[in-house]
Each structure stands twice: as C-alpha cells, then as structure tokens.
Amino acid sequence: MKIICNICYKETILGPEEKEKYFPNDPDDSIRYSECKECRYKRLCLELPLIYRDAVDDYNVMAKLDINKSYFFYGDTGAGKTFSAIEILKRRWENGQSGRFISYPELIFSIQTNYEQNAEMVDEIKKYKQLIVLDDFGAEKMTDFVRQVSYLIINYREQNKLQTIITSNFTLDEIDMYIDRRISSRIAGMCEIVRMSGDKRLTKK
C-alpha cells in the first residue's frame, strides 16, 4: 500500500503490518493521500511565535525533560521557560502526537472582549485531551473574572490528569499570594515544578 503526501507528494510504502494496523480494509495495492509527518510538523510550527519556530536547543534542556509530563516552568524573563515548553511541544509533533500552544494573556484578552462568544473556547481548552501549553500565566491583569476563568481551566485539567505545561514569571508562592490559592494548589498537584535560571539551564526544585 502506498501513501502519498498531498502537500509535498512524498511517497511512503506501508509494510503488511502497518497496513493491517492502520488500513485493514484497503486493498494491498491501494493509494491514499495524506499529509506526511514532515509537512504536518512544518504546518504546526506556523502556529508558534516566529522566534521559536526554528530555535535550536543549545543548552540541551530536553535531556532533562519528559515530553509526556506536565510542568510548571517559572523564572525571570529570558530564562528559557517558553523555549523549554515549546521544545516539548515540538518533540511531540515530531512523534506524530498532538498539542497546542496558547499565549495566556492573549487568550484572556479574547475572552474578556466577548465572553459569550468565546465561552466555547474556554470549554474546548480545558477539555483538550492532548498537551496544552499555557504561556506567560500571570502576565494578564488579574481580576475576579480572570481568576475564575483560570481556575476553571487549570482545575479541570488537574482533576482529569490532562498534560499541561504552564510558564510564568511568578513562583507558586507568589501565585498563592497574589492570584489565587486554589490555582497554585492545582498547579502543584498537576505539574513538576522547575525553576529556570538566568543562563537557561534547568534546576529542579
């Protein structure tokens, strides 16, 4: 059986075991058109901020991280929090897995602009079954509304054991003090806490 990418037209021949696993009802000499892994990866990378699309892991941070875990990366601006989160996301994409990158301040702004229109977005994000990266949590202006939306998302994902990576300039203690104790509690229960130092190297708490 032959698979042809509908973007780059690269051809892949499936062996009998793969064919039986993925397309058991197709004839052995059939042809399917489907996006190849490389084209899928390039398409997904277009959803990332431009500066991270082709970033290189010079500090080898991935040697210390598990692409299937939830993390809370905290530290000063420029310490490598977003880079590390995106590296995990990109590795999952390379493996054919799914995941989404979300700028948290932009999400909150969209929701505040028209909550009724964007309420479904909150529900979709909190229930998304694959990895969600919530980048720059706490950078948005904190109001009771923002606290409630944040709690709804993080509480649901913690309770349902959905992989989540959160980046923030705040420590958990600061989230506890300035944002919401319930949120810091859920993050602590869901994520491995990793402090990012100024030289972009990882130090586990």
Give the role of each language-model region.
Residues 83-96:
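P-loop NTPase Walker A phosphate-binding motif
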Residues 68-86:
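Walker A/P-loop nucleotide-binding motif
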Residues 74, 93-128, 141-144:
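Short glycine-rich substrate-engagement loop in P-loop NTPases that contacts/grips substrate
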Residues 1-63, 193-194, 198, 204-205:
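A short, basic N-terminal segment
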Residues 97-98, 128-131, 160-166:
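Loop/turn-to-beta-strand initiation segments
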